[in-house]
Amino acid sequence: MRRHLLPVVSLLVLLLLVRQLYPYVSGSDPSIVDGYEVNLVSENLGGPTCLVWANDTHLLVCDRDGGRITELNIETDARRTLLDGLHHPHGLLLHEGKAIVSEQGQLSSYLIAEDGLFVDGQTLVSGIPAGNHQTNSVNVMPNGTLIWHSGSTCNVCDEADERNAALLWVNATTGEHGVLASGVRNSFDGVWVEDHGYFFTDNGRDWEGDHPPEELNFLIADAAYGWPDDEPETPVPEGSEAPVGRWTPHTSMNGVDLRPVHSSLPGLSPSEGFTLYTAVYGSWNTLLPKGHE
C-alpha cells in the first residue's frame, strides 16, 4: 500500500513546489494593453499605502514602513517629509484646509501650514483595535461626513468591537463617530460617484481555497455585507447585501477611483455610464499566485 502511495505523495510535493516557484519563473514584466506603457515615476518611497495629489506636480505618499507622509515632486523627484512619527499610515484626505490622516487605530486632523507641513494635530478617533488588519482609507461624503474604512482583527471571527470590520462615519470637527456599514472584513478604499453613491472594495477570508472572491460593493447605510457568515454554501448570507462586482479570491482589491470623463484610459463614455479603476495587490493564497494588477 505504501508503495502505491509514494507516486501520489511525490506528485503532490512536486505540484506544491511548482506553485511556490511559479512567481519566480513566470516572469515579472507587466502585461500592458496595446497603446499604453508603464513608466517609473519614483522609487525608494518605503511602503506606499496612499497617493493623494496636492496639485499638478506634487504627490503625497503615505509611507507605512517609515511612518510618515512624504511630498514628492514628480518633475524633479525632490521629496520632503510633511509629517512623521505615525503608526502605519494607510490613508490621507485633504479637506477644507486640513489633512485627515488615518493610521493604525487612529484618525487625526492637522492644519496645513503655509509651507505645506502638517501641524497642530487633533485626534478625532482613537482606540480602534488592530490585528490581521487595521484602519485604512478615509474619504468624504458630499455632506462633509467622513467615511473611515476599518478592517477586521482576524481572518474569521466575531469582533469584540463593532467598529472593526466596518465602514465608520466620522464628524470631521468633533470626532463623533459610529458604524455606517458592518460585515465588511477588510475594506481598503472607496469612491463617491455623483448621481449614484459610494462604492467600496472588500477583501474576503483566506485559507479556504479559491473562495470567496474579492468584492466591490455599493454602500447602503446601516446595511450588513456578510462577513463572517459568508460560507461557500451561503456566499450572500440572508439579510446581507450582495457585491456589485467580484475579483480573483485573496488578491486584495485595495485602492479604487473613478475614471475621469476625459481620461485616455479605457472606459465608458458619460452617456454609457462610468468606469472604476482598482489597484489589486496580488496573492500567493490563490491556486496559482497572482501579481499586482
Give a label for each model feature.
Residues 1-23:
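Secretory targeting signatures
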Residues 24-32, 135, 152-156, 165-175, ...:
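Beta-propeller domain segments
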Residues 38-43, 78-84, 122-128, 176-181, ...:
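A short beta-strand motif characteristic of beta-propeller blades
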Residues 44-57, 85-104, 128-145, 182-197, ...:
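Beta-rich, blade/repeat-based domains predominating
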Residues 60-62, 101-102, 147-149, 199-202, ...:
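Residue position within the beta-strands of beta-propeller blades
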Residues 60-75:
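Beta-propeller domains
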Residues 72-77, 112-116, 171-175, 219-222:
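Short loop/turn segments that connect beta-strands within beta-propeller blades
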Residues 105-141, 149-152:
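Asp-box/WD-like beta-propeller blade repeats and closely related beta-sheet repeat scaffolds
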